Regions:
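Catalytic alpha/beta core domains of metabolic enzymes, predominantly
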Residues: 30-33, 42-152
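C-terminal alpha-helical cap/extension of soluble enzyme domains
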Residues: 111-114, 118-205
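Conserved beta-strand edge residues that scaffold enzyme active sites
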Residues: 11-12, 98, 116, 178
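Residue-level detector of functional hotspots within protein domains
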Residues: 23, 54, 77, 165-168
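Hydrophobic alpha-helix-in-membranes signature
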Residues: 9, 35, 42, 62, ...
Length: 205
């Protein structure tokens, strides 16, 4: 029942552009011709960067590639993806601090871990942008960054799962190894962050 697929580059071993093109080509050829594809570029984890030239080459070859999710704090790269003579990709940002800048540059949205917990702010920013309230959107963006900064130093996936449990989205915050369980002081910090967020947003649970 999936509406589309996100395809990530292979990890660990570095590949040149030709090898990456062949990889994506082989995966996409195994899909129905009209099945929407997003390239998921997270070079900090895969070590294999999908550069703008490669994205355009892939989009020229495969009409069902509709966009890219880019997870790196590089606004110039966002602009490079969108400045093209060919088909313009739907660009989703995976870096919370660039959400508003991505929209202002021509991106269409975000796919974000913290957004699954603090969704009121992310949806408000998007609505403010759509309504032309750029000053309001900038203030909301600042709030998003402030919360993200408070999470620095706590292991990311365990922190998100703990917050999702606090939010009532999941029943357990257990993570598989090698991710470690959070310490009690780390959980306490997350509880304080979530409580402060609920107070600011007027959330009563």
């Amino acid at each position: 029942g999936a509406d589309g697929i996100g395809i990530m580059s292979p990890a660990f071993f570095q590949m040149d552009e030709e090898a990456l093109f062949q990889y994506y080509r082989d995966v996409i050829k195994g899909l129905p011709e009209n099945f929407p594809v997003y390239i998921y570029n997270i070079p900090g984890c895969t070590t294999n960067d999908v550069k703008p030239g490669l994205l355009q080459k892939l989009m020229e070859e495969f009409p069902n590639i509709v966009g890219i999710k880019y997870s790196s704090p590089d606004l110039m790269r966002v602009e490079d993806y969108l400045e093209t003579d060919g088909r313009k990709p739907e660009l989703l940002i995976g870096c919370d601090s660039l959400f508003l800048q991505c929209l202002m540059t021509g991106g269409v949205g975000t796919v974000t871990g913290p957004g699954s917990i603090f969704h009121e702010r992310f949806t408000r920013l998007y609505r403010q942008y759509q309504e032309g309230d750029y000053a309001g959107a900038a203030m909301t963006q600042k709030k998003i960054v402030e919360t993200d900064r408070k999470l620095v130093g706590i292991p990311g996936i365990p922190a998100l799962k703990t917050l999702l449990k606090l939010r009532g989205v999941i029943r357990t915050d257990v993570c598989r190894g090698p991710l470690r369980p959070l310490k009690e002081d780390e959980k306490r910090i997350l509880e304080e962050i979530y409580a402060a967020y609920c107070e600011e947003e007027g959330i009563h649970e």
